[in-house]
Amino acid sequence: MKTLTGTTEAILNELRAENSSNSSDQIASEVKAIIENVKNTGDQALFDYTAKFDGVELNELRIPNSDIQIATNKVDPAFLEALKEAKANIESFHNKQKQSAFLDSEKDGVIRGQIIRPLETVGVYVPGGTAAYPSSVLMNVLPAKIAGVKRIVMITPPSENGINPHVLAAANLAGVDEIYQVGGAHGIAALAYGTASIPKVDKIVGPGNVYVATAKREVFGLVDIDMIAGPSEIVVLADETAKPAFIAADLLSQAEHDTLARAILITTSEKIAQQTKIELNKQLENLPRKAIAKEATESHGKIIITKSTAEMFHIMNEIAPEHLEVQLENPMNYLYQIKNAGSIFLGNYASEPLGDYFAGPNHVLPTSGTAKFFSPLGVEDFTKRSAFISYTKEALAKEKDAIVLLASKEGLDAHAKAIQIRFEEEN
């Protein structure tokens, strides 16, 4: 890991220079062609792309409910029990996010209000590749269920051995309505446009590789999306009370995701910086995903030594990390200084994987600095708000002159006339 010192601006400039997009014109061009093909040829394009990219010849896209139940019965009962405990925690947290409708009748003859409606159909993308992510199933599906979404469709790319049974078990437990064995940009296109087999959805959520992210960007507007996810990130803030072994383990927990993952320690202590680097190299040797984590920490890992706690928080807020750990003495005292972070972990025993799997808050988080203006996935992301208005003639009469004046100042005479006509004698 590279150590950074110096002025705050110099440190931030180096971090900004590295934080470039993972997409490219070439990838965007390929994705557009894939989307157009799926739009024009539907299921056949999905069969062709699955054979090409996944090496699997499919006879059907939808996974039968009987296969899902067989997979659920096959997994280790202890895994299923852990999944149920995680589900309970996630539901408990997200139930508290539910928004309320309201009715306002403070003025005579005026009724105003807000109604909350769930989206009708949501598509959930679950990655395949080098790791299985049953936790992503729970985190994407359960908030949608709590919001009241009636139809939840999941897609995930197949392998030669089919779909990972742990992913299918998680989908079964979470209450997914339909599962299709298709992934990549072609899977996103199918959800956005619909095919003979796969229904068009209102919103697409879930992480994926750069092709999936680019496809989500392309179809946004036709459907809603959650966010464009970049590589995993973690920033750990530490003082001399922190434990280097804990810091190193938590940095590696993100570095093992992806060679592009960013693992950053910001500390006021040179001693902690040095001990963490030693501990990280020691722990790295025993990781099954050592090659991935090693490349991530060598290419994108940073240890930043600051002169003060205030500088530490300033740099962190500029990074706006996906995951933030505060391993400082009395960490709750610093909560108000955190402006930009996806998910916050306070204290030596609030390790980041606690949020990935079990505590309850969502692990679908803004990355690449977007925590400055985006929030974690939640129940509200699967709902929409509508306002309603009702006026009596008497109530409108009290306000008509002000409305007509505002409309006339904007040069919108038909707006003004729509109010005035209601008070002409024949009406």
UniProtKB/Swiss-Prot annotation:
<feature type="binding site">
    <location>
        <position position="323"/>
    </location>
    <ligand>
        <name>substrate</name>
    </ligand>
</feature>
<feature type="binding site">
    <location>
        <position position="257"/>
    </location>
    <ligand>
        <name>substrate</name>
    </ligand>
</feature>
<feature type="binding site">
    <location>
        <position position="356"/>
    </location>
    <ligand>
        <name>substrate</name>
    </ligand>
</feature>
<dbReference type="InterPro" id="IPR022695">
    <property type="entry name" value="Histidinol_DH_monofunct"/>
</dbReference>
<feature type="binding site">
    <location>
        <position position="415"/>
    </location>
    <ligand>
        <name>substrate</name>
    </ligand>
</feature>
<keyword id="KW-0520">NAD</keyword>
<dbReference type="GO" id="GO:0004399">
    <property type="term" value="F:histidinol dehydrogenase activity"/>
</dbReference>
<feature type="binding site">
    <location>
        <position position="254"/>
    </location>
    <ligand>
        <name>Zn(2+)</name>
    </ligand>
</feature>
<comment type="similarity">
    <text>Belongs to the histidinol dehydrogenase family.</text>
</comment>
<keyword id="KW-0368">Histidine biosynthesis</keyword>
<dbReference type="InterPro" id="IPR012131">
    <property type="entry name" value="Hstdl_DH"/>
</dbReference>
<keyword id="KW-0479">Metal-binding</keyword>
<feature type="active site" description="Proton acceptor">
    <location>
        <position position="322"/>
    </location>
</feature>
<dbReference type="GO" id="GO:0000105">
    <property type="term" value="P:L-histidine biosynthetic process"/>
</dbReference>
<comment type="pathway">
    <text>Amino-acid biosynthesis; L-histidine biosynthesis; L-histidine from 5-phospho-alpha-D-ribose 1-diphosphate: step 9/9.</text>
</comment>
<feature type="binding site">
    <location>
        <position position="415"/>
    </location>
    <ligand>
        <name>Zn(2+)</name>
    </ligand>
</feature>
<dbReference type="Pfam" id="PF00815">
    <property type="entry name" value="Histidinol_dh"/>
</dbReference>
<feature type="binding site">
    <location>
        <position position="356"/>
    </location>
    <ligand>
        <name>Zn(2+)</name>
    </ligand>
</feature>
<keyword id="KW-0560">Oxidoreductase</keyword>
<dbReference type="GO" id="GO:0005829">
    <property type="term" value="C:cytosol"/>
</dbReference>
<comment type="function">
    <text>Catalyzes the sequential NAD-dependent oxidations of L-histidinol to L-histidinaldehyde and then to L-histidine.</text>
</comment>
<feature type="binding site">
    <location>
        <position position="254"/>
    </location>
    <ligand>
        <name>substrate</name>
    </ligand>
</feature>
<feature type="binding site">
    <location>
        <position position="410"/>
    </location>
    <ligand>
        <name>substrate</name>
    </ligand>
</feature>
<protein>
    <recommendedName>
        <fullName>Histidinol dehydrogenase</fullName>
        <ecNumber>1.1.1.23</ecNumber>
    </recommendedName>
</protein>
<dbReference type="InterPro" id="IPR016161">
    <property type="entry name" value="Ald_DH/histidinol_DH"/>
</dbReference>
<keyword id="KW-0028">Amino-acid biosynthesis</keyword>
<feature type="binding site">
    <location>
        <position position="232"/>
    </location>
    <ligand>
        <name>substrate</name>
    </ligand>
</feature>
<dbReference type="GO" id="GO:0008270">
    <property type="term" value="F:zinc ion binding"/>
</dbReference>
<dbReference type="InterPro" id="IPR001692">
    <property type="entry name" value="Histidinol_DH_CS"/>
</dbReference>
<feature type="active site" description="Proton acceptor">
    <location>
        <position position="323"/>
    </location>
</feature>
<feature type="binding site">
    <location>
        <position position="257"/>
    </location>
    <ligand>
        <name>Zn(2+)</name>
    </ligand>
</feature>
<dbReference type="GO" id="GO:0051287">
    <property type="term" value="F:NAD binding"/>
</dbReference>
<keyword id="KW-0862">Zinc</keyword>
